[in-house]
Amino acid sequence: MRLQKGLYYISLQVCVDITMDVVAMLVKDIGLNVEDDYTNIKKLLKHDVITKDEATLLKQYNRLRNAIVHKYDKIKLRSCKRRFKKN
């Protein structure tokens, strides 16, 4: 069970990493300088590439990824599942 939870967290982290890479590519594609994830999300919102709801969701995913990276063993799997089921 512990290994399964670990794989779940790693999968979430990788998905968010890939998503943030796509965000950075979109920022570059519209001719702007790529910065940190949160700034990149704000730039896409400002230039109407994404909606406010999409920006909020991307920020939530990014926070979740950061929590996974920094507090890997302290995150409750149930909490992660609830957050993703909402979306």
Curated annotation (Swiss-Prot):
What GO cellular component term, any one, is given?
Answer: toxin-antitoxin complex
Keyword Phosphoprotein tagged: yes
Kindly list the GO molecular function terms attached to this UniProt entry: nucleotide binding; RNA nuclease activity
This protein's record includes keyword Oxidoreductase: no
> What Pfam families does the database record attribute to this sequence?
HepT-like
O-di-AMP-tyrosine PTM sites in chain numbering: 72
**Processing and modification events after translation:** Modified by cognate antitoxin MJ1547; probably at least 2 successive AMPylation events occur on Tyr-72.
The EC designation for this entry is 3.1.-.-
Q: What class of enzyme is it?
A: hydrolase
| Function (record text) | Probable toxic component of a putative type VII toxin-antitoxin (TA) system, probably an RNase. Probably neutralized by cognate antitoxin MJ1547. Neutralization may be due to AMPylation by antitoxin MJ1547.
How does this polypeptide assemble, per the annotation?
Homodimer, probably forms a complex with cognate antitoxin MJ1547.
Full protein name: Putative RNase MJ1548
Q: Which organism is it from?
A: Methanocaldococcus jannaschii (strain ATCC 43067 / DSM 2661 / JAL-1 / JCM 10045 / NBRC 100440)
Question: Which taxonomic lineage is given here?
Answer: Archaea, Methanobacteriati, Methanobacteriota, Methanomada group, Methanococci
